[in-house]
């Protein structure tokens, strides 16, 4: 699945949410039988309900240019304020949601170069691995525990995010 999307538009309302839910259910059903490989490779990134679809994939491949998060930078800035999250600060945005930090924090399986051949090779490697014994989302209790114990009183930085979700 090539996942380059800002998510459902607010004007799509319940119809958009239902479509996303159908996609989620299809991924969960399919991944029992064959690896479902997600790829985020462009500058649009993957946000909203489709970022959940990305997390449901058996394997997730990103490039350095990719971004992955539940809410996009503009949405966070609108809700939290520019002092909290400046969507124009590209180094900050990529330090929090970019492909490299998502890989280093264990939320994706492969970080590859920005080219068709690199992405294709990683996709073929993921398919060759077959269905994982345990999917990332099967570890929800571990992620919930980590988030519950995280101090949210101050703005997190990339190093804290990497430490919070460090690969074990």
What spans do the regions from the language model cover?
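Intrinsically disordered, low-complexity segments enriched in small/flexible residues
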Residues: 121-168
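Conserved catalytic cores of soluble enzyme domains
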Residues: 7-134
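Glycine-rich beta-alpha loop segments
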Residues: 1
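Substrate-binding cleft of extracellular glycoside hydrolase catalytic domains
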Residues: 4
